[in-house]
Amino acid sequence: MEYRGYDSAGVALLAGDHKMNIYKSKGKVSNLEESAASKDISGHIGIAHTRWATHGEPSTLNAHPHVSQNGRLALVHNGIIENYSNLKTFLEGKGFTFKSSTDTEVLVQLIQFIQDEYGKDLEGAVVSALRRVTGAYAIAVVDKENPDKIVVARKSSPLVVGIGEDHKEFFLASDALPIVEYTKQMVYLNDGEVALLKVGQKMEIHTLDNEDVDPKIKEVDVNLDTLEKGGYEHFMLKEIYDQPRCISDCIRGRLLADEKKIVLSAINQHRDRLLRASRFIIVACGTSWHAGLIGKQMIEQWAKIPVDVEYASEFRYRKPVIQPGDVVIAISQSGETADTLAAFELAKERGALCFGIVNVVGSSIARASDTGIYTHVGPEIGVASTKAFTGQVMVLTLFALALGHELGSISQMELEKYITELSLIPEKMKKVLEQDALTKDISRTLTYARNALYMGRGFNYPVALEGALKLKEISYIHAEGYPAAEMKHGPIALVDENMPVVFVATHHQLYKKILSNIQEVKARNGRIIAIVTEGDEAVKNIAEATIEIPATLPVVAPLLSILPLQLIAYHVAVFKGLNVDQPRNLAKSVTVE
C-alpha cells in the first residue's frame, strides 16, 4: 500500500497465548521493519496499516493500530469519523482516557465500552459501534482474548478480502494489488457490510442491519484495471451505473426520512457563523463549478442569502473582496485541485469561514476546511467526472435545505416534501439507467457530429453545461452549453440540419418558454434531442429523439437529467473508438496550475 502515500506505519500480531505485540514507527515501512527486527514477531493473525495523517500529526503515537484502554483490542482504520468529537466527549464521561489525537482511537474505545457495558462479542460490539458512527471507514479489529478472528467492515472506503487455500487463510487490503501475489480469489465488501474472518472457517458477512450476505468470490488476474472495473468495460460506465448506490451512501445518516429531518454535523459545528453569513462564495473548477451553479440557485431560493460562483483559477488572482462575514465553499472531487485549494487558503487568510465539499477523505481541502461535508460516493477513477457531480449536487441540496429550515425560510411541511422526494432519487436513477439501450441508439447519431449545442433554463442550465463538457471531454466533439433564452443572442446562427441541439427540457416553471426555444430550433431544421419528464408529448412531437426521466420536483431534476447526458457522451466516445477513461490532455486530479 506504499504507493498511496503515508507518514507512519504499524502492526499488531496475535499469538495463541492471548498475547498481542504492537510495533509502530514514524516514516517509512523500512523503519518499522528495522525497529521490529529484533523483537517477537510470532503470531498467526495480524493487522497492519500505513497512515496518512488526518486527525493528529504524523507521529508514532498517532500511528495505527490503536489499542483499547484495557489493552484487549487493536484496530486499524482508513477514513474519517466525522462525529468523533461527540463520541470522545461521551467516552470521557464514562472514564475513558486517550493517548492520541486521532479519531481512530475513539472508535476502538467505543467498541470496548460496548463490550464492557452490554457484554457483546467482538462482532456484535463492532456492529453496535458502527451504528453510532458518522463518516467513512474501512476497519479491521482484533481481540487478544479471541485470537482466532478478525472483524472487518467498510463504508465509503474500499476493503478487499483475499481468500486463501481451502478458505483457511485470509488477506486484507484497500485494493487487490497488494494481495494478488497470494491469492486471486477476492471478495469485495460493499458499504455497510461487516465480515467475520475466523481461523479454519469460511468467512461470514452481515450488514449493519444484521442481514446475512452471501460472499461473492471473484477470480481475478493481476491486471489492476480488471480488478477495479468490476466487470464493466470502462471505469466511466461503472461509475455512471454506481450512482444510485452512491447517492444512497451520500444521504445515509443525513437524510432521515422517518424522522422527517436533515442532520448535517457541518452546520452544527459552525451554526452561528453559517446562519449569520452575509454571502456565500463557491469556488470550484470544471464539473464542480457546474455543481456550484446549481447550489447557488438552491441556497438563494431556500436560505435567501446571496451566492457568487467563481472559477477558482480566476478568483485567486483577481484580488477579490472577501469579508469576515463571508462563507467560502470549495468544491472538489479529489480535494487536491490546486486552484481551488489556493482560493480556499486565500479566503481563510481573509477571515472567511471555509467550507469544503470533497469526496476524498483526508485530502488537502478537507484538512484546510473549518467545516464541510464529504460526498461519500467512493473513489472515482474515470477522468470524466460522473458520480462526483451527482454527489456534489446532493450534498448542496441537503445543505441548502437544512440551512433554509434553520433560518425559517422553509416550513417543516415544505422540508418534508423535499425529504420525501430526495429519498426516492436512487430508485428513480435506476429507472433512468434502464433506458441505456435507447440512449445508446440516440448516441450513434451523434458520432459524426463536429459540433453540438446544449440548452437549458433554470436548474437545467448547469446540467446543459455539464452535458456539453462531458461530450467534449471524451468524444472530442466541440460542444457548448447555453441558457436557452440566450440562443437568440448568437448561438442560433449556428443551427442548421447538421447541428445537434440537446435540450434539457424537464417540467419546471419555465417549461413553456423552453418549448418555444425548441420550436425555434425546429424551424431552422436543427436536430433536436431532448431530456424530458415522463409523459411529455409536446416535446416528443417536435424532437428527433427524447429520453424520459421520472417525474420529480424541478430542483431535484438535475440528479436525474444528467444521467442520459453522461451516457450519451460515453457511448459516442466508444463508437469513435476513443480512450474513455483517459482522454487526451486531461488528468483526473489537477494538482498543478
Residue ranges and their predicted role:
Residues 236, 527, 540-542, 548, ...:
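Generic C-terminus detector
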Residues 77, 97, 115-119, 185, ...:
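Hydrophobic alpha-helical scaffolding
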Residues 150, 159-165, 169-187, 313-347, ...:
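Glycine-rich, anion-gripping cofactor-binding loops and their flanking helix/strand elements
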Residues 48-61, 258-271, 295-331, 478-494:
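Glycine-rich oxoanion-binding loops at beta->alpha junctions
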Residues 45, 73, 279-281, 327, ...:
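Structural motif
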Residues 275-424, 506-545, 568, 572:
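Glycine-rich phosphate-binding loops that contact phosphosugars or nucleotide phosphates
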Residues 131, 243-247, 251-281, 371-500, ...:
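Active-site phosphate/pyrophosphate-binding segments
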